[in-house]
């Protein structure tokens, strides 16, 4: 069951210490850096808010780091939430195994289970953006007692697994005829599978330019148009024959200069091989989804936040949201006038959407 909600808007001690990375107001608890290690993995995470406050864990996607959530952390920490934002596996200060199979969703969910135990294992609100959404959804499906509610941003929930074979059947074939665009807007996903080394090399040719070129605000003029992501194979890569991103200034409305520098520093360390390996595990991710209790049905309250101008993941002009609507017993949907990078494009509006849903859901 789904309902449209809220309308459209314009822990524990850790080895890493408490390095202050900033706060926007005097009444906001300092955002601090921590590191947690288990025998199998190390997770670097940011935290803010009272240690005994209700727990909110925010999971970033590709190609992001935990710092992407700064605005949301500061807002909810100032309201008494204990907010935690890890660098996910392969990113930033967290472990980056060499094997591609180490980035299967079951491994990443295991990371979050260990982190959750380290934080005290109180049932949490799990918030995910982009690839963080499949992680949050899978954790709720496989470990329901750990989740009070789930917020999925940009990428909807797929009970059978967020994998290319499950995405292609949902493509809008009026916009993407199968004979011209067999993988539709997901062509970039296919290209990562078929041209992995080239993709990594192209992204790493100029890290600041790559990140600046990826982080652009959504454009309402793109609605109903073929997405550039559908042309990656035809163009021989995201950047074509240049094999590197064009010189592009970062958008200060998305990342402050200080935070963009931190993002670049993180990718100078990790590169793109580990973060792109998340795309290489369709078979394992589908198999993992099949092991979820009750077919992956979610009984917790779920909020999905859709970007009206998201050329890849918008659920209003395609069938992309159908599996989520069928699988979530208590689903709320809100739409924001933005593209894919909702936590950055609509910082305050996203906070308000989550806040309203928390209140309405009694969370």
Regions found by a protein language model. Give the residues of each.
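An N-terminal hydrophobic leader/cap segment in hydrolases
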Residues: 2-4, 8, 16-34
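Flexible "cap/lid" subdomain of the alpha/beta-hydrolase fold that forms the substrate-access gate
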Residues: 26-31, 43, 91-127, 131-331
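Conserved Rossmann-like nucleotide-binding pocket used by diverse enzymes
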Residues: 32, 55-58, 84, 127, ...
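A short loop-to-beta-strand scaffold at the N-terminal edge of the catalytic core in hydrolase folds
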Residues: 39-47
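Conserved HGGG/HGGXW glycine-rich cap/lid loop of the alpha/beta-hydrolase fold
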Residues: 47-95, 129
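Active-site helix-initiating loop/hinge in glycosyltransferases
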Residues: 61, 104, 130, 345-346
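Short, hydrophobic alpha-helix immediately C-terminal to the catalytic nucleophile
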Residues: 70, 137-141, 351
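Catalytic active-site module of serine/aspartate enzymes centered on a nucleophile-bearing elbow/loop
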Residues: 328-363
């Amino acid at each position: 069951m789904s309902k449209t909600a809220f309308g459209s808007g314009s822990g524990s001690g850790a080895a890493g210490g408490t390095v202050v990375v900033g706060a926007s107001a005097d009444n906001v608890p300092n955002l601090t850096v921590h590191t947690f290690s288990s025998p199998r993995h190390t997770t670097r995470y940011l935290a803010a808010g009272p240690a005994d406050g209700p727990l909110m864990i925010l999971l970033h996607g590709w190609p992001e780091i935990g710092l992407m959530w700064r605005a949301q952390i500061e807002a909810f920490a100032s309201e008494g939430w204990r907010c935690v934002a890890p660098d996910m596996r392969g990113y930033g200060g967290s472990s980056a195994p060499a094997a591609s199979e180490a980035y299967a969703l079951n491994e990443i969910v295991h990371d979050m289970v260990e982190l959750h135990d380290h934080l005290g294992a109180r049932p949490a609100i799990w918030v995910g953006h982009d690839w963080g959404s499949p992680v949050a959804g899978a954790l709720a499906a496989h470990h329901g007692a750990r989740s009070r509610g789930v917020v999925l941003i940009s990428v909807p929930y797929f009970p059978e697994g967020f994998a290319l074979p499950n995405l292609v059947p949902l493509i809008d074939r009026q916009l993407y005829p199968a004979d011209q665009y067999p993988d539709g807007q997901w062509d970039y996903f296919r290209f990562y599978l078929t041209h992995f080394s080239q993709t990594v090399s192209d992204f790493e040719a100029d890290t600041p330019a790559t990140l600046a070129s990826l982080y652009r605000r959504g454009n309402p003029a793109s609605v109903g148009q073929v997405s550039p992501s559908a042309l990656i194979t035809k163009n021989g890569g995201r950047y074509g024959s240049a094999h590197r991103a064009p010189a592009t200034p970062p958008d200060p409305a998305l990342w402050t200069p200080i935070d963009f520098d931190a993002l670049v520093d993180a990718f100078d360390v990790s590169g793109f091989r580990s973060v792109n390996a998340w795309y290489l595990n369709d078979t394992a991710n589908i198999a993992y989804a099949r092991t979820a209790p009750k077919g992956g049905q979610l009984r917790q309250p779920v909020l999905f936040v859709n970007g009206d101008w998201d050329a890849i993941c918008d659920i209003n002009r395609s069938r992309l949201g159908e599996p989520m609507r069928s699988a979530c017993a208590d689903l709320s949907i809100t739409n924001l006038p933005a593209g894919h990078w909702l936590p950055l494009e609509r910082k305050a509006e996203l906070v308000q959407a989550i806040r309203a849903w928390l209140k309405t859901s009694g969370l």
